[in-house]
């Protein structure tokens, strides 16, 4: 799974549910130059940099090879997204008129002729250079035969022997039809053979450059996987990757398959580890039991033995490609998705720090100038923002995970049904905020966030501003709905104060206790599996009140997201778009 700005916005772009800062810029029919320019402006251009100065000569050479490999992933993504994508891209590049250049620009941002944040609607004419362009991205993408219905494919799959059915529904196969119109399953290793052979060669060359054993092992096994179509061993090696160079490359996410959600799209993230930020995770891990033992909840619901923290690393991205550089930028991802790995080893979360920092600069800073009072704007602090994101992710592991219903063991997810994701995301936000305040008071964060009034002002004012960053996208996902609960509850408690003009502030005499009370409410709902209480809380608080709407109305010109230029990649290898 990937995240647009974890924990702030869930990655719903692929489902077409991310709301634009303004009304959708597309309308039926092709977009004009001015419309395409307006649409593109929703993505703030940023120069993405990562510090590679401490890498060995061999690792720098390996990154250059990996960036070269990632460019091939872009080609694969174009092909997987739509059968005519590559032909359309080639035709577009022949048109150097202002309209042609605007189309090229927006096409590349979306890796196709459909605007992702406008519900995957086309910005092109119905036909271009003899190529018919659907008004919306086909649900089947290019994973299934053009024109094949879901019903026909399901009937065919259901008639197959169990092993063949599993192959037809597997992540790494496509379905094609022969001359007689009969469906057949084709492995990625066959369907994309020329590109995968090139990828395998480049990964082996990168492996030869690095002297890091775990990186060498992963690259070698992933090169083998591209040719064998068996990714299991290389996924285990990716879980064990412990290298200054961090690489995710291959077919992973299934969002592009909107017909069944079976087929994995190729993506690449070439990054370098951030050891300092990753050490913060280790620090939190050492205090997990202490935090659990002090959660604002009845003692009977605390876990006397908190499990090990799931693997998590912080990186700075050097290059992104394919599904990893399309539309709204991924800020974190949780992989692999293969249930065999998850059952045995769990999954690994990768946090892209420089992507989140770029989003902070391009979206949260302008929002702060609109919704915080002038005297509070100086408190906006990336370190507080990012550390709270880390705390959010970590505190998903705290609190109740088992309930008792009628004498039988259950889980909050089962008990709370459709309300669970909203309650859990809000719980992680608030528990993360509580945990940072608790550790600040204990002096445990003196060397990172600091201690005392100035540090608390930064923490809470940054959190207040980030609330509006989430609500900027509308109440379309569990993170935003959870944030609406938090904002409205804290307003009702007087911990957040509305000044009637679309600006807000924190009452520092009330905020700590209000956060504790709200956290207790979320934790108790989960501990008791109280579905009715969760429903009532959502009915009361999942709304945009007039004072909050006034702030959101001022934010229409704030960019939705960023558009990175991979400056470090270009300096290392001549890469970059």
Which residue ranges define each predicted feature?
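Gram-negative bacterial Sec-dependent N-terminal signal peptides
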Residues: 1-19
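Short linear, low-complexity motifs centered on an aromatic residue
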Residues: 2, 21, 84-87, 222, ...
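Long, low-complexity intrinsically disordered segments that are proline/alanine-rich
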Residues: 16-28
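N-terminal helix-rich structural modules
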Residues: 27-218
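Fold-level signature of zinc-dependent metallopeptidase catalytic domains
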Residues: 36-48, 53-65, 163-445, 449-467, ...
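Zinc-dependent metallohydrolase catalytic domains
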Residues: 76-83, 357-367, 372-387, 400-577
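Long amphipathic alpha-helical segments
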Residues: 83-87, 217, 236-241, 477-482
């Amino acid at each position: 799974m990937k995240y647009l700005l974890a924990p702030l916005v869930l990655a719903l772009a692929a489902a077409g549910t991310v709301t634009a800062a303004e009304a959708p810029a597309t309308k039926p029919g092709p977009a004009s130059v001015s419309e395409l320019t307006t649409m593109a402006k929703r993505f703030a251009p940023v120069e993405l940099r990562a510090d590679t100065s401490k890498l060995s000569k061999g690792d720098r050479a390996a990154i250059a090879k990996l960036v070269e490999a990632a460019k091939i992933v872009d080609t694969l993504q174009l092909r997987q997204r739509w059968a005519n994508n590559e032909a359309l891209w080639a035709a577009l590049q022949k048109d150097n008129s202002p309209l042609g250049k605007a189309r090229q620009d927006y096409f590349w941002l979306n890796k196709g002729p459909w605007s992702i944040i406008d519900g995957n609607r086309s910005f092109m004419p119905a036909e271009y250079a003899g190529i018919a362009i659907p008004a919306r991205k086909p649900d089947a993408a290019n994973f299934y035969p053009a024109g094949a219905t879901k019903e026909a494919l399901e009937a065919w799959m259901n008639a197959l022997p169990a092993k063949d059915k599993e192959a037809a529904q597997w992540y790494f196969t496509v379905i094609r039809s022969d001359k007689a119109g009969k469906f057949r399953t084709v492995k990625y290793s066959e369907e994309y053979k020329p590109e995968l052979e090139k990828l395998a060669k480049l990964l082996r060359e990168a492996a030869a450059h690095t002297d890091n054993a775990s990186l060498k092992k992963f690259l070698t096994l992933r090169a083998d996987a591209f040719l064998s179509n068996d990714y299991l061993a290389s996924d285990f090696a990716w879980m064990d990757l412990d290298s200054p160079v961090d690489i995710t490359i291959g077919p992973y996410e299934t969002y592009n398959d909107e017909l069944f959600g079976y087929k994995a799209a190729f993506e690449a993230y070439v990054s370098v580890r951030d050891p300092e930020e990753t050490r913060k995770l280790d620090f939190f891990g050492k205090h997990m039991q202490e935090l659990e033992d002090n959660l604002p909840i009845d003692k009977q619901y605390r876990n006397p033995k908190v499990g090990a923290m799931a693997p998590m690393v912080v990186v700075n991205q050097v290059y992104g490609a394919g599904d990893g550089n399309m539309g709204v930028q991924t800020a974190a991802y949780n992989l692999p998705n293969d249930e065999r790995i998850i059952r045995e080893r769990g999954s690994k979360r990768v946090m892209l720090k420089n992507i989140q920092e770029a989003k902070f600069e391009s979206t949260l800073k302008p929002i702060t100038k609109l919704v915080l009072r002038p005297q509070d704007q100086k408190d906006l602090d990336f370190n507080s923002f990012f550390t709270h994101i880390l705390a959010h992710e970590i505190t998903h592991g705290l609190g109740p995970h088992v309930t008792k219903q009628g004498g039988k063991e259950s889980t909050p997810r089962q008990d709370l049904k459709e309300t669970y994701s909203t309650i859990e995301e809000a719980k992680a936000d608030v528990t993360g905020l509580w945990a940072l305040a608790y550790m600040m008071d204990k002096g445990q964060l003196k060397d990172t966030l600091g201690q005392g009034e100035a540090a608390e002002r930064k923490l809470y004012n940054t959190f207040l501003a980030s609330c509006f960053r989430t609500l900027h996208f509308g109440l379309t996902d569990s993170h935003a709905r959870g944030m609406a609960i938090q904002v409205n509850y804290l307003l009702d408690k007087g911990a957040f104060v509305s000044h009637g003009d679309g600006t807000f502030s924190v009452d520092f005499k009330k905020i700590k206790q209000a956060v504790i009370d709200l956290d207790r409410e979320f934790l108790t709902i989960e501990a008791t599996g109280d579905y009715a209480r969760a429903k009532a809380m959502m009915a009361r608080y999942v709304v945009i009140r007039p004072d909050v709407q006034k702030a959101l109305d001022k934010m229409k010109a704030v960019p939705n997201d960023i558009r990175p230029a991979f400056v470090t990649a270009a300096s290392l290898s001549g890469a970059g778009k």
